[in-house]
């Protein structure tokens, strides 16, 4: 696997020097300063590449080229935004980058309710609390019909949770959910968020699938022409939230995506932390079934709690993800590719990490502190090395 590291650009508290010292050789980044829907100029892409090259690093994967909401709703200026997206892909390929990660989650990117959940050892993790989220939907956002998405017991618990909140608690929870986490290019006020939600009235799972299919039929031929591997990231969490459909959550969704545009360039980001939230997602089976379409991996683990929809992020070798078996399956796919002459290792990044040690006293991007990810990368690297020595001696060390 190619060891990579996500970097949010010059304003990221984690520097390129830090990344190099972590042992990563590739960087996963994007042009975060360019608004959604605007073409990425070749000059801007090359400038970012030069910044990385100055530190002996390469831009391995683009994460992400955000998809404008007009494309997801198939409304407004969606056709122009698709054409802009196509041109951005051409420009990325012109600069020699061959992998693009993206997602098709409506409105929000990945979602958490607590960005500072304290673990027994004193480190901090990200957490999604189903009851806190219900309290937000039912009593803060006051989304019409939200009660239909929660059990009677969850509604009682949510009301008690809300009644115990201070104004500061309400503001913090609201900000955590709608203000935009790292990688999400847009944040909202409550009124703006309600207006965005209204744009999805009448868009169910079938319609969102059709909108995504239209997008894929437009951009995958471009990816084929220029040699780009598109790698869709799963929904996080992998289920409908806020009354919005989500369509990249299960192995059935992966099969639908494959069949919709059956091209090797129409592939997946295997995010074990996103898919792994669902107990019914067999991660190894997913890798074995769609191995040739997995162009990028995010390796992390989560811990499901008493309410199966509540989870927090565990250590990379802990929690509900069997990282040993996952890495073994990825290496098996790499071995298959190398036997066919494809020597490019699958890019992997240690996704998220606990805020720990000295990082507890620093300003960090939630989930993207340096030391927690350094620990995760070292752990995954150790698993990979042990597996290669034991089972895959022919793979490039």
UniProtKB/Swiss-Prot annotation:
InterPro entries: Man_deHydtase, Xyl_isomerase-like_sf. Its EC number is 4.2.1.8. Its cofactor is Fe(2+); Mn(2+). Pathway: Carbohydrate metabolism; pentose and glucuronate interconversion. It holds the Pfam family UxuA. One of its GO terms (molecular function) is ferrous iron binding. It catalyses: D-mannonate = 2-dehydro-3-deoxy-D-gluconate + H2O. One of its GO terms (biological process) is D-glucuronate catabolic process. Keywords: Iron, Lyase, Manganese. Belongs to the mannonate dehydratase family. Catalyzes the dehydration of D-mannonate. This is Mannonate dehydratase. The gene is uxuA.
């Amino acid at each position: 696997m190619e060891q990579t590291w996500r970097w949010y650009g010059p304003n990221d508290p984690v520097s390129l020097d830090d990344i190099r010292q972590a042992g990563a050789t590739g960087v996963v980044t994007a042009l975060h300063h360019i608004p959604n829907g605007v073409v990425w100029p070749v000059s801007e892409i090359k400038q970012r590449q030069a910044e990385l090259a100055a530190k002996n690093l390469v831009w391995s994967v683009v994460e992400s080229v955000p998809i404008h909401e007009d494309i997801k709703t198939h409304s407004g200026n969606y056709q122009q935004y698709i054409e802009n997206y196509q041109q951005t892909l051409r420009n990325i390929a012109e600069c020699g980058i061959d992998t693009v990660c993206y997602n098709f989650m409506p409105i929000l990117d990945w979602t958490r309710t607590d960005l500072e959940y304290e673990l027994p050892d004193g480190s901090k993790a990200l957490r999604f609390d189903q009851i806190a989220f219900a309290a937000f939907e039912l009593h803060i956002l006051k989304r019409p019909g939200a009660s239909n998405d929660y059990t009677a017991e969850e509604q009682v618990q949510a009301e008690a949770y809300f009644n115990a909140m201070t104004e500061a608690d309400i503001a913090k929870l609201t900000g955590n959910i709608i203000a935009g986490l790292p990688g999400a290019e847009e944040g909202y006020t409550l009124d703006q968020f309600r207006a965005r939600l209204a744009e999805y009235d009448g868009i169910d799972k079938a319609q969102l699938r059709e909108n995504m299919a239209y997008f894929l039929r437009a951009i995958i031929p471009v990816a084929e022409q220029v040699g780009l591997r598109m790698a869709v990231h799963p929904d996080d969490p992998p289920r409908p939230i806020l009354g919005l459909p989500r369509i990249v959550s299960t192995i059935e969704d992966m099969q639908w995506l494959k069949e919709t545009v059956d091209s090797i360039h129409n592939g997946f980001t295997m995010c074990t932390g996103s898919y792994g939230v669902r107990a019914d997602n067999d991660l190894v089976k997913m890798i074995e079934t769609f191995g040739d379409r997995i162009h990028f991996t995010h390796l992390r683990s989560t811990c499901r709690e008493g309410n199966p929809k509540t989870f927090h992020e565990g250590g990379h070798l802990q929690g509900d993800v069997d990282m040993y078996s996952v890495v073994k399956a990825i290496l098996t796919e790499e071995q298959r590719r190398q036997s066919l002459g494809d020597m490019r290792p699958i890019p992997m990044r240690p996704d998220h990490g606990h805020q720990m040690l000295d990082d507890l006293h620093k300003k960090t991007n939630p989930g993207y502190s340096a030391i927690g990810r350094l620990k995760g990368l070292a752990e995954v690297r150790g698993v990979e090395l042990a597996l290669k020595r034991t089972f895959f001696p022919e793979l490039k060390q």
